[in-house]
Amino acid sequence: MKPGFKDLRAVGYQTDVPYVSLSNYCWSFNCPKPGAEVEFLNMTFQLMNSTATIVQIDADIEQSIDMVSNGSADITLVSARQTLDRMKKVDFTTPIGFVYYGYLVREIPELAVADYIMRLFDYDTLAILISFGLIIGALLYLYTWIFGLRVRSLLDWMFISCSGIIHQFMFRISSPICALVLIGFWLLCCLVIITYYEAKLKSFLLLSHHRGTIFNTLDGVLEAAEHKGWTLVIQERGYTPYLYCNPSQCARLDRLKSRINFIGADDDANLLLGQDKHVGFSALASDLAETDITYFDYHSKILFVRDKIMAPEYLAYAVNKNVKGLREKFNRAVAYTKSGYGTVRSRYIASFPSYNSVTSQSQTITVLQTSHFIQLYKFCFIFYGIAIIVFILEIIFHRMTKNFTFFGHSYNYHLSGFEWRFARPKWIHFPRRNTVILPLSKSYSPDNERRVTVC
């Protein structure tokens, strides 16, 4: 056997169960059950006919990579995420796995999910609909007062408009042109109902397939913190959303500083995550979290929910660029030992049990909020403001020029009558399956309608 490397120096965490499990009493590769990745690294060194020692410094991943980069160590004790910034400092070996970003959250009971589904309207949406009802009622009162038609009190018209909104009546106006501002407000009210009520209901019906959780993306977590009172839990030396957030998401995180609970590296995060409306951030190897939702702590009912947008990242050991031949020889050895990594890891921890393996989690759910349509509302209000200005100018012009002369010709300008009505949506008949309705005869009557059922 060819001689290998002698006295390689490995550096990393002192304790990061199940990957590293060292103590002040035993800080070497010969410790009993030193951790899955420490044992795997030692097994690979033995195949390389190499020896190594562990630098007795409790260093996190960033500190370990810096030490490998400046020559204080030769290789990391555990695998690390392979990123472009780190590749500028060190070389990476053949990946031994993947890591998935995700969120730690206590299981949400089905009753709570059902309650979340039923709470379709927020206060801002109710305020919009109520204000539209009052505006439409006031405009109806104004138009009927101007044109002297069906004079009612202001409260009566507001009650009629709100009733029409609740029943989703169609509102039709035939004249005058200036009164189209009224139908504009009516259509905007219908837009709020359709985009918020019906679309959000559909979103939550899809979301009910995701039993146990109400979000699976960073945007969903941020919306829960912004609008639903959730608290973000970030642990020192752990994974944070700043590792993978885009600029807009990072800005939202900065605005949510008051909603973030920072805890120490030695604190038990499960004590906080077991409370209502608390969510933590983590990343698990693919062999531990094999499905989209898994039990991180079965007894505490804490789930690990994979992020549906972020792609997994490689996990590999970082080696010093200046140690000639170390990476190549290590990679050749890993080609033989990699298949046994699962066996080594299973001696320390089993894969987390799947929470909902049957349910398909392939869809990315977007929970619609009123804020998603702010730009559309702005454009609508701008156009309606223009329409109101035109309406006022038309009334002023009417008052000033009832009779005017232009190039010797007399003209009369008057506003046409105000005509409006509520109309129920047309009733549409949907026949049952396998039912054929024959064409009507000329002498048709409802009593002799013929139907043929296809078997």
From Swiss-Prot:
Residues in coiled coil: none
Glycosylation sites: N42, N49, N70, N403
Entry keyword Transmembrane: yes
Cited PANTHER family: PROTEIN CBG02446 (PTHR22714:SF8), PROTEIN CBG02446-RELATED (PTHR22714)
Name of the featured protein: Uncharacterized protein T25E4.2
Alphabetical keyword list: Glycoprotein, Membrane, Transmembrane, Transmembrane helix
Signal sequence range: none
GO cellular component: membrane
Pfam families hit by this protein: SBP_bac_3
Stored Gene3D superfamilies: Periplasmic binding protein-like II (3.40.190.10)
Annotated S-S bridges: none
Subcellular localization(s) per the UniProt record: Membrane
Top-level taxon of origin: Eukaryota
Transmembrane segments: 127-147, 153-173, 177-197, 377-397
Bilayer disposition of the protein: Multi-pass membrane protein
